[in-house]
Swiss-Prot record:
It comes from Pyrococcus abyssi (strain GE5 / Orsay). Its main location: cytoplasm. It catalyses: L-threonine + hydrogencarbonate + ATP = L-threonylcarbamoyladenylate + diphosphate + H2O. Disulfide bonds: none annotated. Its EC number is 2.7.7.87. PROSITE patterns: YRDC. This is Threonylcarbamoyl-AMP synthase. GO terms for biological process: regulation of translational fidelity; tRNA threonylcarbamoyladenosine modification. L-threonine binds at T35, H67, R121, A141, S181. Belongs to the SUA5 family. Required for the formation of a threonylcarbamoyl group on adenosine at position 37 (t(6)A37) in tRNAs that read codons beginning with adenine. Likely catalyzes the conversion of L-threonine, HCO(3)(-)/CO(2) and ATP to give threonylcarbamoyl-AMP (TC-AMP) as the acyladenylate intermediate, with the release of diphosphate. Does not bind tRNA.
Amino acid sequence: MTIIINVRERIEEWKIRIAAGFIREGKLVAFPTETVYGLGANALDENAVKRIFEAKGRPADNPLIIHIASFEQLEVLAKEIPEEAEMLAKRFWPGPLTLVLPKSEVVPRVITGGLDTVAVRMPAHEIALKLIELSERPIAAPSANISGKPSPTSAHHVAEDFYGKIECIIDGGETRIGVESTVIDLTEWPPVLLRPGGLPLEEIEKVIGEIRIHPAVYGKSVDTAKAPGMKYRHYAPSAEVIVVEGPRDKVRRKIEELIAKFKEEGKKVGVIGSGSYDADEVFYLGDTVEEIARNLFKALRHMDRTGVDVILAEGVEEKGLGLAVMNRLRKASGYRIIKV
């Protein structure tokens, strides 16, 4: 049985205490953050963390992010905290930024995929912070979806994947950003962007200078993943996804051509983007990159529910949040990309 705790209208501490009790007991709780919903367990309880991997069907070498509510918790989890980490934490925490640091001995290796590094962030969401505070434990939490599927931006999405399989879902409404956190590896110099996300790379570079972009961001395969989203296919709906990149007018013409082609083949076609199309299903993502990021996973899940055979997606410019949007679209498509 799964308990759904509704705090959409008002955050009541006694309700969050119920969920915190589940965390202390080694059980799983799905909760909202500013990015996507997380599937949380006590980060210091190895058996509880293993349940996350089992519930999601997640490969054991795909690390988890630990969520904290205070800098003091970071000092427990990380063996070393470089000056750059302190600068970034001071500027961007709470917020959608994950830092990869040398792990301390208290962090179970099941969380880190067997590596000597740990990924940590402080979420900018009142419910998430209150849950961590009341459970009195750091919380390990990947996105609250079956591995490989689009990430959840609402409690409804979580319930689609996990109702009856986990102990508790906290319903705090839709998430504000819609894509996962940005992950920066501070164990190398210059620092490395392992995953683009809700905090644009340009903002981080203003604080600590140049950051290298890991080749995995653009699809290069890796043997070892220091962060989630690097090694395996992610964010994918059931339908085939094709991303069309290029100038907006050319993208539109190409998508219209593809709609006609697939309809001739008897396929049901969906389109996600900012234009209107004569497709079977069209999901309008918005006009700004912030709106597109917020609605992307919702759109992919919507297309799954409508039963389309093919999803055609408009590419966006890779600036600001656009880098994260394109990273997610490319992975969702399995790198089926048409450039025009």
